[in-house]
Amino acid sequence: MPFSPDIAYSINYALGKYFFHRISHFLESA
């Protein structure tokens, strides 16, 4: 069952925010 575009977009958006938060936190603690 394929994802609908809006679901895929929201998943990509959530993953993008998550990784951006992790990377920025890693750079701050480095």
UniProtKB/Swiss-Prot annotation:
Lineage: superkingdom: Eukaryota
Further comment: Completely overlaps ECM38.
Protein name as catalogued: Putative uncharacterized protein YLR299C-A
Organism this protein belongs to: Saccharomyces cerevisiae (strain ATCC 204508 / S288c) (Baker's yeast)
